[in-house]
């Protein structure tokens, strides 16, 4: 027979077990542990919080200039990005976009694409909340024929419906989609608009002619405050994103348990103000260290023109790259670097982005201090299956640079307009002032200050992927 003391001991053990497994508030944690966990949380969560900024501006905040439309509605623009577009850093002006968000919690969705001209590059990029590019549809993967594709969340189980070409499975129920449709020139905008109008999205129930399932209640999306990604509010947004994730991804359970000790987790109960002052201060330090870690990784790899091909991709690709190329235990830093330099960039097989942060002498690019050139020797233009471009970005805003030509890039679709050198070489002029002695067709206007350049190779050939071909350096003009 148990004594009262024994019963109380058993009860205490049970209560302790339940608290350890199901507690929603922060557990006892030292400032040192809080600092380390906050640093880890920042590197892990930065891409998701930056993604939330885009989600909120595009889908939730109807008063935002960047607002696109509600969930599960294809939204396209037959235009190119300008300096007024500020929601996505390092934007692309080569291919008019359709950009929209899916909510798969109720049921899967079917996305259909039209037949495309054989020489036109296009693709549909599908990105989960982690910012993994989990699937593609398009020229390089499924071809230019018409097709329909079933997009499903992590909990869906079923068979491939008739009329659907493939199932594309996301780790998360919330998905971002970007379609890119090649523009051959200003006169081609009408045709691009026609193609965009043929992109179609249907709930699975409508596609098969069945009854629609109940719609789950909408999450309580917190208002986005610009700058939150760089201060204490970051942790609240990460907490919310974990409610959308619901469960940890592969290998993430230990991190989620550590975050739970700070009160950050899928129940959405995080309250930074309720934490002890010394823990708040430790988390501030950890957050700053996390951002410094991202910046340090970028700086350490600034001389690698092909780094973009290593930081965008599937979960599996990033894990392999982190281990093989950088000897890292996980790929969180790769996702964060990608989000910081250019959210929603493409996987290497679709496009790579050789990036210029410094000139051939190792000095940061600065339009107020120098004029520059990039010269492609004869036969050394970027090797691509589709096309290539070179785009200018302001070094402070990471956006396009206003200029009198409204020119933000040079690309291979205008090769006939370039002035070639006698031996067949191509020299591009990178400077803030209009050139005096050279054709303006080769001029890419720079800001009166720091800048960086991104070369985009769509459908890169093997020589570009394995380093056999390397981008020429940016040379200071003599």
Task: State what each model feature region is.
Residues 24-478:
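A compositional/structural signature for long, glycine/proline-rich flexible linkers
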Residues 2-10:
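Bacterial N-terminal signal peptides that target proteins for export
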Residues 17-20:
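C-terminal motif of bacterial Sec signal peptides marking the signal peptidase cleavage site
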Residues 1-2, 69:
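Intrinsic disorder/low-complexity signature
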């Amino acid at each position: 027979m148990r004594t009262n003391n024994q019963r109380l001991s058993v009860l205490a053990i049970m209560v302790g077990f339940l608290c350890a497994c199901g507690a929603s508030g922060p557990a006892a944690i030292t400032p040192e542990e809080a600092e380390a966990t906050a640093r880890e949380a920042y590197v892990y969560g930065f891409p998701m919080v930056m993604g939330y900024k885009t989600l909120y501006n595009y889908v939730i905040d109807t008063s935002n200039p960047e607002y696109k439309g509600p969930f599960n509605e294809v939204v396209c623009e037959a235009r190119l990005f300008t300096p007024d577009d500020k929601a996505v850093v390092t934007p692309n002006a080569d291919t008019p976009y359709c950009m929209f968000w899916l909510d798969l919690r109720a049921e899967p969705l079917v996305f259909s694409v039209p037949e495309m001209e054989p020489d036109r590059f296009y693709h549909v990029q599908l990105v989960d909340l982690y910012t993994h590019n989990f699937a593609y549809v398009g020229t390089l993967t499924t071809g230019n024929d018409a097709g329909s594709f079933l997009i499903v969340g992590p909990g869906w189980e079923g068979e491939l419906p008739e009329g659907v070409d493939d199932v594309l499975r996301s780790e998360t129920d919330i998905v971002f989609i970007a379609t890119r449709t090649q523009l051959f020139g200003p006169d081609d905008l009408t045709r691009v608009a026609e193609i965009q109008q043929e992109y179609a999205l249907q709930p699975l129930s409508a596609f098969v002619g069945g009854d629609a399932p109940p719609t789950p209640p909408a999450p309580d999306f917190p208002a986005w405050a610009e700058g939150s990604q760089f201060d204490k509010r970051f942790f609240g947004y990460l907490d919310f994103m974990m409610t959308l994730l619901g469960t940890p991804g592969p290998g993430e359970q230990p991190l989620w348990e550590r975050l739970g000790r700070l009160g950050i987790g899928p129940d959405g109960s995080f309250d930074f103000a309720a934490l002890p002052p010394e823990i708040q201060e430790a988390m501030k330090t950890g957050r700053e260290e996390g951002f410094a870690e991202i910046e340090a990784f970028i700086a350490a790899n600034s001389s690698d023109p092909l780094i973009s091909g290593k930081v965008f991709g599937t979960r599996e690709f990033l894990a392999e790259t982190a281990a093989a190329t950088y000897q890292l235990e996980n790929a969180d830093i790769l996702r964060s670097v990608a989000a910081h330099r250019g959210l929603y960039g493409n996987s290497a097989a679709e496009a790579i982005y050789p990036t210029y942060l410094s000139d051939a002498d190792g000095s940061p690019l600065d339009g107020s201090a120098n004029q520059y050139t990039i010269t492609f020797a004869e036969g050394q233009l970027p090797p691509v299956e589709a096309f290539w471009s070179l785009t200018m970005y302001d070094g402070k805003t990471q956006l396009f640079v206003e200029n009198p030509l409204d020119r933000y890039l040079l690309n291979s679709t205008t090769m006939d307009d370039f002035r070639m050198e006698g031996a067949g070489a191509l020299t591009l002029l990178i400077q803030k002032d209009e050139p005096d002695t050279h054709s303006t067709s080769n001029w890419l206007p720079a800001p009166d200050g720091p800048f960086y350049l991104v070369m985009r190779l769509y459908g890169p050939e093997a020589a570009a992927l394995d380093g056999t071909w390397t981008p020429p350096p940016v040379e200071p003009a003599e």
